[in-house]
Amino acid sequence: MKFSIITVVKNDKINIESTINSLLRQNFSDYEHIIVDGNSSDGTSEIITRAIRNKKKIIYIRKKDKNLYQALNRGIKIAKGDYVGILHSGDKYFNDKVLELVNTKISNKIDILSGFLIYADNDLNKKRIWNYKIKNLSPYSAFKIAHPTTFISKKIFKKIGYYNILYTIASDTDFLLRVSKIPNISFTLLQRPLIIMRIGGLSTSFSKIFRKIYEDFKIYFVNFKYLFILQYVRKILYKIRFN
């Protein structure tokens, strides 16, 4: 089994090296690391270039994108792995055995796998954990999934397409809802932490919260019509647990 791990970055020279090293420390080695850089100008690209000289597993794309999701799509389209994982700049794996663990639990019959997400401060001190239980993936349970922890079969993208770049901050919500509607979708949950995410990312910053609410409302209305308020309230009440 081969993984394609995608990192999107722009002007994050402080954190990008620790993210790269988190992947390099993994015990499991059958992966490629695709870094999509939105034309960083702060020295990020020099750090990535230095890492490439030392390790040949990195595929580097440097190009201006409209948003995070267009950058993710660029990476997914060139990915050669069986499964696509995400490791945003500033984030890291919970330990050096995450990919090894995922490899033992996943198979070509599984469409999507996810686990728990740890929120941390800038010094990576644990603040809270996004843990949950899902037996069957459906439009009514998809909101529980911690998107940064997902490993998604490349076949899924070929089946339903990529992230919708019209959404600038909540396209993962739209994507997971589309995935959940696939007939007989095969989902596996690992009830343990996979990713440590620094608080202050695209959708965890207070300055972005209203945009997130607007896009979520739009996505939920498209998917649930007049029941969207009820389903959206369920999501909000669920997320309050982790704040």
Name every feature range the model reports, one short phrase each:
Residues P193, S205-I229:
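Catalytic core of nucleotide-sugar-dependent glycosyltransferases
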Residues K2, Q26, Y220-N243:
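Membrane-interface aromatic/basic loop that binds lipid-linked glycans or pyrophosphate carriers
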